[in-house]
């Protein structure tokens, strides 16, 4: 195959978030050994700079990824945080994961942070001097140290096109997955208006344009075929970006709603997560937001918050 694409980081990231969101303790117990193994695999593959070594990424050498890439370490970072939440609810010893996450966050900035094409953002790998679309990935895992320059770079003419983000500046190749991650990350950073403008543009192009009605995988490879994973990533722009939902336990989450200025309300209904079915309703009240969480006809929380404030929910 393509070698180590950072699969262990991907599995740990996805499985821990899935287990938390599902809210099924028995299923989480079954997944725990897999998550633990993947985290340990990543730890054993840390290089001398404290980031994860991998000889490829999900693009499988279509574009250079060096000996350690930003994507793998960012996913590992988020996986450590999610595993900390999950392990706590399962009664597992998880203190080491928090320490490892703190160290990794510093190492990511030290190793990957730098100026690329005039933007104080991230090198995708050591020696990378051309902007890459995956500089968006830290924004999706709560790493915002370089958010301003990173967002400027993402939406600069070097990367942004009528088809979303180019995989690499100067190329003609685009894979929708990085555009979909980027839009989620820009919402997560609180750049709501910018994210909404570009989400509207992307949606009219992809979902309502000539090649419809789904997000696509790539071009020119595969001739813009539709894959379900990209449509899932589109949904995550809404759930994790616009509504800012972040699981913190098998029956708890934190969320930060990002209501676009020209909207007076937004609702997300019949959310099936944390072993519940619930709604989130957000209304604009002057310079504040009225935010309600309703499950089984009962109001779990109803609060006024400032823009950018988060709300913690425990069922």
Predicted regions mapped to residue ranges:
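Short, positively charged
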Residues: 38-49
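Aromatic/His-enriched, Gly/Pro-containing loop or helix-boundary segments
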Residues: 1-5, 17-18
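Short amphipathic coiled-coil heptad-repeat segments
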Residues: 107-112
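A short, charged helix-loop
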Residues: 56-61
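Active-site core of glycosidic bond-cleaving carbohydrate-active enzymes
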Residues: 8, 29, 33-36, 40, ...
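Non-catalytic C-terminal accessory modules of carbohydrate-active enzymes
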Residues: 188-315
């Amino acid at each position: 195959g393509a070698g180590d694409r950072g699969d262990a980081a991907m599995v740990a990231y996805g499985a821990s978030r899935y287990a938390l969101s599902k809210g099924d303790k028995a299923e989480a117990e079954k997944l725990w050994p897999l998550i633990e193994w993947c985290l340990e695999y990543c730890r054993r593959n840390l290089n001398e700079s404290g980031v994860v070594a991998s000889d490829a990424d999900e693009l499988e050498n279509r574009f250079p990824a060096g000996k350690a890439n930003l994507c793998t370490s960012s996913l590992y970072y988020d996986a450590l945080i999610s595993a900390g939440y999950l392990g706590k609810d399962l009664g597992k010893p998880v203190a080491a994961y928090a320490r490892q996450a703190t160290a990794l966050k510093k190492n990511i900035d030290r190793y990957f942070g730098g100026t690329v094409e005039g933007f104080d953002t991230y090198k995708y790998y050591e020696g990378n001097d051309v902007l890459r679309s995956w500089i968006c990935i830290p924004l999706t895992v709560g790493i915002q140290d370089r958010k301003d320059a990173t967002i400027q770079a993402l939406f600069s003419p070097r990367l942004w096109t009528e088809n979303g983000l180019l995989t690499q500046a100067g190329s003609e190749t685009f894979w929708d997955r990085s555009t979909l991650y980027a839009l989620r990350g820009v919402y997560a950073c609180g750049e709501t208006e910018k994210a909404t403008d570009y989400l509207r543009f992307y949606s009219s192009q992809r979902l309502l344009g000539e090649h419809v009605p789904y997000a696509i995988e790539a071009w020119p490879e595969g001739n813009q075929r539709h894959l379900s994973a990209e449509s899932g990533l589109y949904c995550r722009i809404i759930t994790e970006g616009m509504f800012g939902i972040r699981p913190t336990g098998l029956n708890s989450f934190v969320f930060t709603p990002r209501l676009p200025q020209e909207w007076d309300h937004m609702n997300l209904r019949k959310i099936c997560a944390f072993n519940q079915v619930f709604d989130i309703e957000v209304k604009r009240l002057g310079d504040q937001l009225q935010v309600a969480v309703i499950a089984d006809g009962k109001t779990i929380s109803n609060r006024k918050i400032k823009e950018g404030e988060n709300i913690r929910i425990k069922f």
